[in-house]
């Protein structure tokens, strides 16, 4: 069989998503069931951490789950001779407009360890071929500094995604404090009209190095105009690295962004709380991150760390 496009393959593995083409949501009941959360108010099952596109008959799954497990589930529904898979390694991105240099060295061994992990140095070299990284670091230990160093060292256009606009402003000021980046090289993407203008003329964003955006901005635009437009936005901006601040928050939206921007070279999930407060959601969150290389830099004797107790 001759495959004319990537969509002709049954299973496609991207940098931050696995896509099953030409399928129905009911084709893989045991697989889908793992992502179900019982809604006590509406008395129904809601699915998080996955997405199904009924128009194109495509199922989006997290890249962090076992690929072989997914393959077996898909193969069980069809003739093995008809199964086909493809690993997509596009890695199209732009370099920063000019070199970004750090103003200060890591302040302690925790930051050094986080940087070695995030940059796949030393004992973490084995992760060089990976595309997703989870850095679990206590608040106040320098999440913004770590992200700044990674962006500076790799020299690739990046985006920081947070839950609130005010937090983006804090990121902006901290990054300028830690690096020599010029304020004009940082762009805060606000509102659908701005995204529309970028999609119509991406040259207006030429010579930029860092983009800042909230979950709600991307969620609103994706829900209104289609999530493929969010993927196109990242492509037009030449983004090669995305940072999710407090990755455990806005979990489903984070998943949808990962699926839409599945060919972004690297994704960093940075959080001080690598878990969800709801027990069912926490199980799915951990499944989402199952095979994502992660590092926990918490010191239980020193660091104040949040523990959740579910009250039923």
Question: Where do the model's predicted regions map?
Answer:
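The Walker A (P-loop) glycine that initiates the GxxxxGKT/S ATP-binding motif of P-loop NTPases
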Residues: 135-137, 246
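N-terminal accessory nucleic-acid engagement/regulatory domains that precede
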Residues: 1-80
């Amino acid at each position: 069989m001759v495959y004319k496009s990537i969509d002709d393959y049954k299973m496609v593995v991207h940098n931050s998503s696995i896509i099953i083409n030409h399928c129905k949501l009911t084709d893989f009941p045991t697989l889908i069931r793992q992502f179900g959360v019982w809604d006590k108010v509406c008395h129904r099952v809601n699915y998080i951490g996955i997405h199904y596109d009924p128009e194109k008959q495509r199922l989006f799954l997290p890249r962090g789950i076992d690929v072989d497990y997914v393959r077996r589930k898909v193969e069980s529904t069809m003739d093995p001779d008809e199964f086909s898979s493809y690993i997509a390694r596009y890695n199209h991105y732009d370099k920063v407009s000019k070199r970004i240099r750090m103003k200060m060295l890591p302040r302690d061994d925790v930051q050094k360890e986080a940087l070695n992990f995030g940059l796949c140095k030393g004992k973490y070299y084995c992760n060089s071929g990976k595309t997703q990284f989870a850095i679990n670091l206590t608040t106040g230990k320098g999440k913004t500094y770590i992200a700044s160093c990674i962006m500076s060292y790799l020299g690739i256009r990046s985006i920081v995604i947070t839950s609130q606009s005010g937090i983006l402003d804090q990121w902006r000021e901290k990054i300028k404090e830690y690096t020599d980046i010029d304020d004009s090289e940082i762009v805060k993407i606000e509102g659908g009209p701005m995204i529309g203008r970028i999609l119509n003329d991406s040259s207006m964003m030429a010579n930029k190095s860092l983009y800042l955006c909230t979950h709600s901005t991307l969620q609103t635009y994706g829900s209104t105009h289609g999530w493929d437009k969010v993927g196109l936005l990242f492509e037009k901006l030449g983004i090669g690295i995305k940072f999710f601040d407090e990755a455990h928050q806005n979990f489903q939206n984070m998943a949808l962004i990962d699926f839409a921007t599945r060919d972004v070279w690297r994704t960093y999930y940075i959080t001080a709380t690598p878990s969800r407060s709801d027990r069912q959601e926490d199980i799915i969150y951990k499944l989402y991150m199952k095979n994502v290389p992660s590092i926990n830099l918490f010191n239980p004797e020193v660091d104040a760390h949040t523990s959740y107790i579910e009250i039923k």
